[in-house]
Swiss-Prot record:
InterPro entries: GET2 (IPR014802), Get2/sif1 (IPR028143). Component of the Golgi to ER traffic (GET) complex, which is composed of GET1, GET2 and GET3. Within the complex, GET1 and GET2 form a heterotetramer which is stabilized by phosphatidylinositol binding and which binds to the GET3 homodimer. It comes from Candida tropicalis (strain ATCC MYA-3404 / T1). Residues 41-73 are annotated as: Disordered. Keywords: Endoplasmic reticulum, ER-Golgi transport, Golgi apparatus, Membrane, Transmembrane, Transmembrane helix, Transport. Belongs to the GET2 family. Residues 41-52 have a biased composition (Polar residues). One of its GO terms (biological process) is retrograde vesicle-mediated transport, Golgi to endoplasmic reticulum. The chain crosses the membrane at residues 174-194, 221-240, 285-305. GO terms for cellular component: endoplasmic reticulum membrane; GET complex; Golgi membrane. It is found in: Endoplasmic reticulum membrane; Golgi apparatus membrane. This is Golgi to ER traffic protein 2.
């Protein structure tokens, strides 16, 4: 029996390249990549190049935890996190006092002179006084300027605002009180004659025919009415003048504001302002009488429908 020997397998060119590539990778994996790279670069060069380090031999960075083990942090109060922020008021609905303060600061430098005093003839001062009168507060007297309006002291400004609010409250309070008194007195006078004097409501035209008779129920009624009106008007003027509210109520008139604006162009109007203010005061007093007469007319009109 003859020995049979196997001939070595013939490797193809592709397999040779693959084996060569695997051997090269194995050498580089052993840390020889840098030497091989320098050997290749130095071939064909008469000058020795500097050492080059292969990226395969560079140490790969390892991920390290940056967390520092320390004590547990302080626990924050949940009320500080969960509490909602204060609501922001809508545009245009801010506090009126804050708006007045801003407007006051804007004109403060223009109102005050070089010596820090207020010039009564300054048109800006007059405009500010008109705005102050329009808010329903006790405005300054004729020809006077309230320098405390433009004070830099916030305490003084707060005091002036509180004083204005108090004067406005006093005006409304006393006017409402006198209104109740006027209505009660007029109704009492009317129903007293209606219930106690038979001829007061005997006919639709009894208040005309009774003028020629012995009893004059309508004349007596108007006599008591006139007496009550005089007493009420005098008390109204006394209370408002004593509290300093009578003049303040007159200064809120649109006529006085127009005259104050016109006096910037025609200074002669300042001469007539006291007269107009006095006329407006009398007009308010007569308005009380006219209002009570209107109530009497309504009562007599209702009386004419009862018979």
């Amino acid at each position: 029996m003859s020995d049979s020997t196997d001939s070595p397998a013939v490797l193809s060119a592709e397999e040779k390249r693959r084996l060569l590539r695997e051997r090269r990778q194995a050498k580089m994996a052993k840390g020889q990549a840098t030497d091989r790279l320098n050997n290749i670069l130095s071939q064909g060069s008469s000058v020795k190049t500097t050492g080059v380090k292969s990226v395969l031999d560079e140490p790969q960075p390892t991920a390290t935890s940056s967390a520092i083990h320390d004590e547990d942090p302080d626990i924050q109060d949940i009320s500080e996190i969960a509490s909602p922020p204060p609501p922001t008021p809508p545009i245009g609905e801010g506090s009126p006092e804050n708006i007045d303060d801003i407007f006051q600061k804007m004109l403060q430098q223009q109102v005050q002179g070089k010596d820090g005093k207020v010039d009564p003839n300054d048109p800006i001062v007059q405009i500010m006084n008109m705005f102050k009168d329009g808010s329903g507060a006790d405005g300054p007297q004729e020809g006077d300027v309230n320098a405390n309006e433009f004070s830099n002291d916030p305490v003084e400004n707060k005091y002036q605002q509180d004083l204005q609010a108090y004067d406005t409250y006093q005006q409304k309070l006393w006017k409402s009180r006198f209104l109740v008194i006027r209505v009660v007195v007029t109704l009492f006078n009317f129903f007293y004659h209606y219930l106690n004097v038979p001829s007061f409501h005997a006919s639709n035209y009894s208040y005309v025919r009774d003028l020629a008779q012995d009893e004059f129920p309508v004349r007596n009624f108007f006599t008591w009415f006139a007496a009550f009106e005089v007493i009420i008007v005098l008390q109204y003027y006394t209370v408002f003048h004593k509290l300093g509210l009578f003049h303040a109520a007159n200064q809120n008139s649109m006529i006085m504001k127009l005259m104050s604006m016109g006096s910037m162009v025609l200074p002669q109007l300042n001469t007539y302002q006291p007269l107009v203010a006095r006329f407006l005061g009398y007009y308010e007093l007569f308005g009380i009488i006219f209002g009570d007469l209107s109530l009497v007319i309504v009562l007599f009109g209702l009386l004419s429908f009862t018979k």
